[in-house]
Amino acid sequence: MNPKKLSITLSVLLACAFCAGLIFNASAQKQSKHPYASDKPMPEPALFGEGVISTAEDDLNAAFTPDGQTIYFTRNFPASKLGVIVVSHFRNGKWQPPEIASFSGQFTDYDPFVSPDGSRLFYCSNRSEEGKVKNDFDIWFVEKTEGGWSQPKSIGAPINTKSNEFYPSVAADGTLYFSSNRQGGKGGFDIYRSKLVGGKYGEPENLGDGVNTASGELDNYISPDQRFLVFAAYNRPDDLGGGSGDLYISQQQNGAWTPSKNLGPKINSPVREYCPIGSPDGKYFFFTSYRGNLDKPLEKPFKNYQELHASLTGVLNGRGNVYQVDLSALGVQ
């Protein structure tokens, strides 16, 4: 072959290979992108998973596996006092209809949380170790196995007591944060943490005045590095929800928690906000809200029964829905 032609041919082949590499890398990046990721900034809360995750039912919590491809949440049935943890998988470009999680469906279960490494899923339940219904809620967990989740196990003492324990949230080092109305608190529910040492949880410690008050604090989310804590508080003077619950944030500085701040009208509304959690990639913040079409006085009457029925049975009917917003909206420094 003519040396000149050979040189041109090699140049073309190299260029094609380079372009193919770019296309492959772009495709790989696109495929590895978490399904909840947005191509545009999300400075304002937006409804998440409408019709599948957020529905006309009372939907709360949003616990993702580390790869973001699976979400566990609670479908709540207040009238029957039943809460069921369900799971949805992201397949074929969309969230699939939820199924009952393998460890739920018989007792009242809430507040799923997947550990940062994906090895455990924590939740709270009114089940007892004897397989009967209790009068209080305890923290339970399941462990990841080759065949799925293990059988549920009680986290036991000193975490669980005869009082209620709710909303487990686990940091990267295994430290467990939770809420409880046990004796010795500041009033109502307080938020506690228990350090994992040698595979065992130590005596829980109350997070103190920066976080807890006599009003009641629960539904806590701890960042993996324990730099900040987001939680729900009730009946505080600055509660935008009239006492029904707002989300607050406190940051850990030099081992102490800063006085908590209301996240303001960008996150909170005139109704209830709770169940905070961060996404596995640390870019987004999810929470549950009861905001909807019926949380303020109507400007005009319904035209007919069909319009009333559509409003009462629609996604924004005032029951719980999951919302997503950029984590930067929290103002964490």
Name every feature range the model reports, one short phrase each.
Residues 1-31:
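Bacterial Sec-dependent N-terminal signal peptides
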Residues 29-333:
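Short, conserved micro-motifs composed of acidic
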